[in-house]
C-alpha cells in the first residue's frame, strides 16, 4: 500500500495538479476512450477521476483502439477525448482534422521517454550472443533462431493485434523486408493480452522472442526487452505516412525503413473544448506522465490484477487525490 501511495502521489505531481478546497465549475458530460492497453487504460481512468472529482464533469469511458477510436472521433465527433493517440498511425488524417477544426491536439506529449519498434528478449541474447551486435536486418537472415509455434520450419515474428495502427505498419514492413521469402511468418497475437502473453510464455520457457513492442510499458521493464536498431535509415514521411501506415491495398510498394520517431498526443473533439471549458482543456494541456512514473504505475498494475479497487482508491482516498486544478 505504501508503494502504491508513493506511485500515486508521484503521478499526481507529474500531472501538474494540486489540491484545493474550493469547488470547480461543472463542465457537462464527456466521453473518453479507454483503449485496450495498460497505459491507455490508466490514463483514461485517471482523467475520468480528476475530471469528475476536480471539475464536476460527468465522464463516460468507452472501449477503444488506435484506429477505430480515431476514425470515430474524426467522422462522428465521439468519443470526446483520446488520452493516448499514437499519432504516427494517423499522421495525415489527423493533420487534416486539426486544420479543419474537427479535432484539437490538446497535449503534444502526454508521456515522455516513449518509443516503438522491434524488440528481442534476453533468451535470444543468451542463446545467440552474437545477436547483441546485430541489426534487425541481419537478424532477419536467421529465421531459424525464432521458430514459429505454428510451423517450426519458419521464423515467427510477433506483430500487433487487429485495430492497432502498428498492425498495418508491421504488415507492410513484413513485405518491405521480404520476410516471407526469407522464411518468416507474421504472427497475430489477437489482443493486447495475447501480445503480452507471448512475451511472458517465452520468458517462462526461456525461448527466443522477436516482435513489436513499445515503451514505456511494464513489459519492457519486467522482461528486460532490448530494442533493435533496424540497420536501415528512416525512409521519409512520404513512405511512412502514405504507404507503411495504410492498408495493404493502399501500399503497393513499401520501402524498407526504420520505425518513425514515436509521437503520442492527447486529442479532443471540438465538443470537448466547448463542453469542458477552458479549465478542463487546460488540465489536459498540462498533465504529463514522465516515463519512469508511468512505468512504475504499469508494473504495479501488472502485478496486481483485478484493478477495480485501484480506481476506487484513487477516487475515494482524498488524502491522495482530492479536488484538483491545473497549476497556473
Protein language model features and the residues they cover:
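Ligand-binding pocket segment of bilobal, Venus flytrap-like solute-binding proteins
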Residues: 71-72, 79-87, 158-239
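Short, well-ordered beta-strand elements
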Residues: 27-39, 57-62, 154-158, 284
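N-terminal segment of the mature folded domain
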Residues: 67-125
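A bilobed periplasmic-binding-protein/Venus flytrap-type ligand-binding module shared by bacterial periplasmic
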Residues: 115-128, 262-276, 299-300
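C-terminal functional modules
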Residues: 272-273, 281-328
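Short, polar/charged alpha-helical segment
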Residues: 39-57
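C-terminal lobe and pocket-closing loops
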Residues: 223-283, 287
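A conserved helix-loop-strand patch within extracytoplasmic ligand-binding domains
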Residues: 103-159
Amino acid at each position: 500500500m505504501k508503494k502504491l501511495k508513493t506511485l500515486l502521489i508521484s503521478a499526481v505531481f507529474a500531472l501538474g495538479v494540486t489540491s484545493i478546497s474550493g469547488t470547480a465549475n461543472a463542465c457537462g458530460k464527456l466521453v473518453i476512450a479507454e483503449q485496450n492497453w495498460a497505459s491507455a487504460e490508466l490514463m483514461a481512468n485517471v482523467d475520468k477521476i480528476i475530471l469528475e472529482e476536480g471539475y464536476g464533469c460527468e465522464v463516460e469511458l468507452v472501449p477503444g483502439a488506435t484506429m477505430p477510436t480515431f476514425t470515430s472521433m474524426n467522422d462522428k465527433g465521439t468519443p470526446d477525448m483520446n488520452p493516448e493517440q499514437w499519432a504516427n498511425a494517423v499522421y495525415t488524417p489527423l493533420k487534416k482534422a486539426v486544420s479543419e477544426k474537427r479535432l484539437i491536439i490538446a497535449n503534444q506529449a502526454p508521456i515522455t521517454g516513449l518509443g516503438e519498434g522491434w524488440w528481442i528478449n534476453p533468451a535470444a541474447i543468451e542463446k545467440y550472443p552474437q545477436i547483441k551486435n546485430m541489426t534487425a536486418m541481419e537478424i532477419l537472415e536467421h529465421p531459424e533462431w525464432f521458430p514459429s509455434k505454428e510451423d517450426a520450419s519458419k521464423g515467427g515474428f510477433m506483430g500487433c493485434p487487429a485495430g492497432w495502427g502498428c498492425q498495418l505498419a508491421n504488415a507492410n514492413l513484413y513485405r518491405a523486408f521480404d520476410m516471407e521469402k526469407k522464411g518468416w511468418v507474421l504472427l497475430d497475437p489477437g489482443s493486447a493480452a495475447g501480445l503480452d502473453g507471448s512475451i511472458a510464455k517465452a520468458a517462462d520457457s526461456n525461448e527466443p522472442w522477436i516482435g513489436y513492442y513499445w515503451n514505456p510499458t511494464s513489459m519492457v521493464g519486467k522482461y528486460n526487452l532490448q530494442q533493435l536498431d533496424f540497420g536501415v535509415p528512416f525512409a521519409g514521411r512520404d513512405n511512412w505516412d502514405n504507404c507503411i501506415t495504410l492498408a495493404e491495398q493502399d501500399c503497393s510498394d513499401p520501402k524498407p525503413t526504420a520505425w518513425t520517431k514515436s509521437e503520442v498526443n492527447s486529442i479532443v473533439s471540438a465538443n470537448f473544448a466547448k463542453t469542458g471549458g477552458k479549465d478542463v482543456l487546460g488540465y489536459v494541456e498540462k498533465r504529463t506522465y514522465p516515463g519512469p512514473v508511468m512505468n512504475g504505475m504499469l508494473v504495479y498494475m501488472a502485478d496486481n490484477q483485478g484493478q477495480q479497487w485501484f480506481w476506487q482508491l484513487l477516487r475515494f482516498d482524498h488524502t491522495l487525490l482530492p479536488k484538483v486544478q491545473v497549476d497556473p
